[in-house]
């Protein structure tokens, strides 16, 4: 179960919407990893591979996923909100709902982090904790499934359609800078 956070993305920062989509694939991957570890180990001792997979997934959600949320909430969504067109109002209401979902996900990730650290430190989880861990992972998978669908099928295409190329380029620079990188 070796997992690498740094797998080569399909997009570069010159395609910021593609970069956001790549992040969604990583979120799905690492939630699947947590679900797999939870199902295999059932709160018991973790094999070396399970431990490494758990640590990698937790690290991704602690660092990478928070940057992704900032990419959307600080880079993409404000640009969409700055466009004053009546035909975009319904979509912007969806953007508001997405931000609410991000807050819900943040709370879920915090609890998963706490339980995952506990599991790694103690070597096992009590029944109530392992049940809660599995529930949280399932809840986050459901939450992200809906969130990602709205973003990829509605919000991202709208962004490409309404944002000028210069704004998309600026987004790419901001996303790269958030990761301490020069834009490719």
Which residue stretches match the model-derived regions?
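Small-residue-biased structural context
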Residues: 1-184
